[in-house]
Amino acid sequence: MKLLLLLALLLGAVSTRHLKVDTSSLQSLRGEESLAQDGETAEGATREATAGALMPLPEEEEMEGASGSEDDPEEEEEEEEEVEFSSELDVSPEDIQCPKEEDTVKFFSRPGYKTRGYVMVGSARTFNEAQWVCQRCYRGNLASIHSFAFNYQVQCTSAGLNVAQVWIGGQLRGKGRCRRFVWVDRTVWNFAYWARGQPWGGRQRGRCVTLCARGGHWRRSHCGKRRPFVCTY
């Protein structure tokens, strides 16, 4: 009898011990699963935060895509319509008189370049009237410029006449991607001296080119404006 009681006590102690071990193991497993879930949650939050810091909001992407540069030649702009020279005279050819000698300054290109004669005309004309005067009165064209040295020479001459801008022979032709600048005397366009923001920036959308007496830079201007001009002959 005592032996049976002793065996029962031993079996109860062993069962209680196993139960504690199983409970501890279960708690340990649950703790590890909880830590793993917490780690995955933290890692996912880190990934989301990183992605949010690097990627702009959809509204920002749309705004960035919609923003354009004013220097882009393909940007929509209000600009002067292209008009052929023969139809742009504001008055009849008979009403256009050749400039008086006292209203002009004649000069020649600098040594080292092809010698040509030039005349700075102080009386203001529209671009095409000026070109007509150059052809009729001097058997030439509005001047084309192919070097910085000659550009500086024209600048100094125009400054001597106390004028702000003068017409030179540059003109914008074509539309859209086919737009390009040409010289009215049909020489190659191999030199330019544009002011900052020109020729595609700023508010000037004319198709004709002026040279500024201050600085010698070029600007686009509406061809119908009246300005002094430079002829070659």
UniProtKB/Swiss-Prot annotation:
Cross-referenced Pfam families: Lectin_C
Gene3D superfamilies the record matches: Mannose-Binding Protein A, subunit A
Compositional bias of kind Acidic residues: 58-93
Disulfide bridge map: C134-C231, C208-C223
Post-translational modification: Nitrated.
Propeptide feature ranges: 16-114
Regions annotated as coiled coil: none
InterPro entries linked to this entry: C-type_lectin-like, C-type_lectin-like/link_sf, C-type_lectin/snaclec_domain, C-type_lectin_CS, CTDL_fold, EMBP_CTLD, Eosinophil_major_basic
Location of this chain's protein in the cell: Cytoplasmic granule
Record field: compositional bias (Low complexity): 42-57
Keyword annotations: Antibiotic, Antimicrobial, Disulfide bond, Immunity, Lectin, Nitration, Signal
Residues spanning the signal sequence: 1-15
UniProt xrefs under SMART domains: CLECT
One GO molecular-function entry: carbohydrate binding
Domain C-type lectin: 132-233
GO biological process: defense response to bacterium; immune response
Region (Disordered) location: 24-96
Function: MBP may play some important roles in the allergic reactions and inflammations, since MBP is capable of releasing histamine from mast cells and damaging the epithelial cells of bronchial tubes. Antiparasitic and antibiotic.
Name assigned to this protein: Eosinophil granule major basic protein 1
Organism: Cavia porcellus
Gene for this chain: MBP1
